[in-house]
A protein has these predicted regions:
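N-terminal helix-loop segment corresponding to the beta1-alpha1 unit
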Residues: 2-143
Length: 143
């Protein structure tokens, strides 16, 4: 005669990570590190695809510096409001600075940052990146 399956037992006590653990002691535990924590990423991207890709790096813990062109105060390269939800979503977890890559001073600051960076992301047209001197070959010489 077949036996009837037994019902699973309900635990009588709630499970805890450690005996005697309290909310106060849990607050002292170190936070888990994010996978890209400690990486420096320079973000020269504009429009949708580039900022979305770099946002993922920032979400995973990379220190992302978004480099913006002068004259974009209040708006991004597409004309969207910097204070709107779309801009805020695309550029969350990023720091930002303004650099004029067409000026010798701005380019010098960028090159100093690029020498220390782990990653430089850009999505300029080929002629633009070469004219600005931020193409792969130019930046790779520094780092």
């Amino acid at each position: 005669m077949p036996t009837k399956p037994k019902a699973a037992k309900t635990p009588t006590k709630p499970a805890t990570a450690k005996a005697g653990a309290t909310l106060k002691s849990a607050a002292r535990l170190p936070l888990a590190r994010l996978p890209l924590e400690g990486l420096l990423v320079l973000d020269l991207t504009a429009h949708r695809a580039g900022p979305t890709a770099v946002r993922q790096l920032a979400d995973w813990g990379a220190d992302v510096i978004k480099i913006e062109q002068p004259g974009e105060e209040g708006h991004d390269a597409t004309g969207s409001s910097r204070h709107g939800p779309d801009f805020q979503n695309l550029h969350r977890n990023k720091r930002s600075m303004t650099l004029n890559l067409k000026s010798p001073e701005g380019k010098a600051v960028f090159m100093a940052l690029a020498a220390k960076a782990d990653v430089v992301v850009e999505n300029y047209r080929s002629d633009v990146k070469h004219r600005l001197g931020v193409d792969y070959d130019s930046v790779a010489k520094l780092n």
